[in-house]
UniProtKB/Swiss-Prot annotation:
This protein's name: Alanine racemase, biosynthetic
General function of this protein: Catalyzes the interconversion of L-alanine and D-alanine. Provides the D-alanine required for cell wall biosynthesis.
Record pathway: Amino-acid biosynthesis; D-alanine biosynthesis; D-alanine from L-alanine: step 1/1; Cell wall biogenesis; peptidoglycan biosynthesis
One annotated GO biological process: regulation of cell shape
EC category name: isomerase
Short name of one Pfam family: Ala_racemase_N
Family: Belongs to the alanine racemase family.
Residue positions of the active site: 42, 257
GO cellular component, as recorded: cytosol
Amino acid sequence: MMLSIVRSVDVVLEIDLAAIRANFQKISTLVGDKVKVAAVVKSDAYGLGLVDIARTLIDAGCDLLFVANLDEALLLRSSFSRVAIAVFRDEFDRFGTWYRSHGLIPVVNNCKELHAVGTAGEPQSYFLNVETGFSRFGLSVGDIQREYLLRTFERYRPSIVLSHLACGECISDPMNQLQRDRFRTVYDLLKPTRGSLSASAGVWLGKSYHFDMVRVGSALYGIHNAGVQTNPLKPVVKLRARILDVRSVPAGEAVGYGATFRTDRASRVAIVGIGYKHGLPWSCANKIFVRLAEYSAPSIGRISMEYMIIDITDVPARRCSPGTFAELLSEDFTVNDLGAAAGVSPQEALTRLGAGCTRKYLNLFPPSAAFTANRPTEAMSNPSRAKSRPMDKQALI
């Protein structure tokens, strides 16, 4: 018999859904009416919760979602019956039955998948990925030119041709123009197929990079391009963690693993219930501050698995007693700032925190007509009837 212990939550990641809606609308306004805004919700919506974030975006008017794999796509389809769902990976030539039976759109990444689409036995909508300088996925420009000469695209034309910028976050990098020009070659060849070159970073590069659609992920979640001086996006997350204990430490004493910090005065320190288990980067030790009401307190010593230690010597005791919550992310210190302090991308920092912390959603508005139209039918609500269960890929290999 297992003993169940009810415990208070020590770490809370607050997610402002109104801010996500506002960011979607802001980007839609920025790119203009002629450019579609699709939402990237891969990796559990960057750790913020796939279904909850998808519901928010559908409510904001989004009608196309991109996910990483079929597992995520099937989870979405079991909740939303009508929204278009595109899958970046999981090959159509191996899993075509799953795509067709659940109305999913494959992103075709090589010639083998392309030909599998053509021999599917029934029309299959698909997006075509072209490699323009990232060296990750996609058909080369030469591959596409060859298939064009073979009239492949006359028999089964892609709905959208897409690519991905390697250096979009650096506005002046010449790679951006090189990739845009390569993409333009394929885009012009395959007209009237629509084109999508830019993800979040490319939104800020100007209209010549927008084509017919932008695929926005990190920008929706408040991560801004470091190359853009003004940030019009709303911050989406706040991170709070509970103070578990307060201690007095003499001058000259070591703090934490490795004795990487020693007090230079008689100090008061607080042990905060957040560590790298929760996604706080180990590398941000001794580099960040937490907020305690109107006061700030520096992180000292290494980040451990469950805890971090902060110096509260200059903070009044009434502001930092055990049980008090310290604020690690806010409008003043964002996930961009945390990533910079830790030497990781803000996308990595956010995804780790989202996976490791208890989430609390703010501003859950009533669903709009757009969301209501996407409510699953009875069959879609029942995974056994809709067959929208997590994929057993091993059985198909």
